[in-house]
Each structure stands twice: as structure tokens, then as C-alpha cells.
């Protein structure tokens, strides 16, 4: 999983201008993020049509505010530069919940 460098929303949308992406918003201190993180390699393998990008909330706080990421862990799907879906809240997310979200896009 690629780790996103610090950038603003406009630069991010340029980066995501072609293809399908899942942005995984997380932070090292977040217990719910640590809960889902071990499942991410398997989720990535099962959804290989997407490129997964890890976004560290603390390194990209302005981007998170601009994108209205109000809780972590959160997932935002982009296709060809446009946001397609989001699973954004402050609740713990299970592997099944993330997979169900991605299956329903």
C-alpha cells in the first residue's frame, strides 16, 4: 500500500485523475485503525481492481479537514479523479464491513 505524501485536495485529485483508488485514512495512535490494519493486506488482495493509498491523518490534517474526514479509520473511493463513495465515521470497522462497502460501489 502506497503512503500518501503531504498534499492538498487539488493535488490529490490530480494524482487520482485516472484509475480506481481507495484512500485509507488512519493514524498510528488510533486504536480502531490498529484493529483494521492487519486485515488490510487481505482486503487489498481481494479488491485488486483498486490501488490502495494510506493517508496518515496527522501528516495530512488540512487535507482531512478539506475532505470532511470526521473520524478514522475511514475509506474514500475515487475513480478517474472523482469521489465515488465514502465510508467515513469514527466507528471501529471490521474486515467484513470494509469488504461489504467495497462490494457495493
Q: Predicted segments — roles?
A:
Residues 1-21, 97-105:
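N-terminal leader/targeting and pre-domain segments
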Residues 34-46:
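Typically the conserved alpha-helix immediately C-terminal to a functionally engaged Cys/Sec
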Residues 19, 26-29, 71:
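Short pre-active-site segment immediately N-terminal to redox-active cysteine/selenocysteine motifs
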Residues 77-105:
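Non-catalytic, surface beta->alpha helical segment in thiol-disulfide oxidoreductase systems
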Residues 67-76:
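Structural micro-motif
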Residues 5-7, 25, 44, 48-62:
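Thiol-based oxidoreductase modules, predominantly thioredoxin-like and allied folds used
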Residues 30-33, 75:
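The canonical Cys-X-X-Cys-His
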Residues 35, 66-67, 92-93:
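Chalcogenol-based redox active-site neighborhoods
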Amino acid at each position: 500500500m502506497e503512503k500518501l505524501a503531504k498534499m492538498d485536495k487539488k493535488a490529490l485529485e490530480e494524482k487520482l485523475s485516472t484509475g480506481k483508488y481507495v484512500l485509507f485514512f488512519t493514524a498510528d495512535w488510533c486504536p480502531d485503525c490498529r484493529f483494521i490494519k492487519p486485515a488490510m493486506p487481505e482486503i487489498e488482495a481481494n479488491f485488486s481492481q483498486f490501488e490502495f493509498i494510506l493517508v496518515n491523518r496527522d501528516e495530512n490534517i488540512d487535507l482531512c479537514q478539506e475532505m470532511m474526514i470526521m473520524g478514522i479509520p475511514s475509506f474514500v473511493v475515487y475513480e478517474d479523479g472523482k469521489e465515488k463513495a465514502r465510508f467515513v465515521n469514527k466507528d471501529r470497522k471490521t474486515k467484513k464491513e470494509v469488504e461489504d462497502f467495497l462490494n457495493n460501489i
